[in-house]
Amino acid sequence: MLRRWRAWRRKRLEPVLMKTRPLLEISVETLDAAIAAERGGADRLELCQNLAAGGITPDVALMREARKKIRLSIVVMIRPRAGDFCYSAAELERMKRQIELARRARMDGVVLGILTPRGGVDVGRNAELVELAKPMPVTFHRAFDEGKGDPAELRARLEDVIATGASRLLTAGGHPTAEEGCRKIRRLVRHAGDRITILPGGAIRPANLRSIAQKTRAKEFHSGLGGLLPYPRRRYEEFEAGVRELVRVLEESSRVSLESADS
């Protein structure tokens, strides 16, 4: 009887499970990639250019075209150049203009991050940009991972990011990849509570996503599939299939969690 009840419960909860699996954000730098990611089942897109350098602000024409073609939520990178994350006054003004262009292009959010010359989170400057971006939510990007990776330092930096008013933090837990930083990401998730969303990212692929999801217990994940397929020569059909596989892994991981709760 107990086995029957569990099977019945899983069947009844399947539609809910499909809707409540962790959210998947995919980074893209072309319109074709954005369309492929949407077809593959992504929930949100991060739009940027020059992914090989970590991403910079895309051309406004790409923002507008993506908005016309894509129904998903789109967040856009606000980064005036590649390299470090310590910006001059002129670069800060450029970031402000880029935020305004993103607003006019009807983007759903922005992704940014400014550090101090010593490598800490520049709370004042970031807070200024967060305020300027409203009502668009702000994701603080992996500039967060540039500093020391010990737990105490990560907690302190997390508090600084929260103080900026950002809604989301993209991080690999102070490591090059999310897989390496799983334990620290989990600590950040616990420490953040409901004050900010922790978004694990960094070489996330179908082969390691299940483990990362189970270890971090995060509610959102970020991937560019860069570790799976060569860019930019990959076929977009393969990119779409890769996104679809990431979605499948998240759904399966959620299903396993449900079954574990039943046992």
What residue spans do the PLM features occupy?
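Hydrophobic faces of well-ordered beta-strands that scaffold small-molecule active sites
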Residues: 22-26, 45-47, 74-78, 110-112, ...
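Glycine-rich phosphate-binding active-site loops on the catalytic face of alpha/beta enzymes
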Residues: 46-56, 101, 105-117, 166-181, ...
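Glycine-enriched alpha-helix->loop->beta-strand junction motifs that scaffold or abut catalytic
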Residues: 39-45, 70-73, 106-109, 132-136, ...
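Active-site mouth loops of central-metabolism enzymes
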Residues: 19-29, 78-96, 115, 140-153
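Hydrophobic, well-structured mid-protein blocks that either form specific transmembrane helices
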Residues: 103-164
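Catalytic cores of alpha/beta
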Residues: 32-36, 86-98, 145-164, 185-188, ...
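Alpha-helix-loop-beta-strand connector modules within alpha/beta enzyme cores
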Residues: 55-82, 121-142, 180-205, 238-253
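Tryptophan (W) side chains
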Residues: 5-8
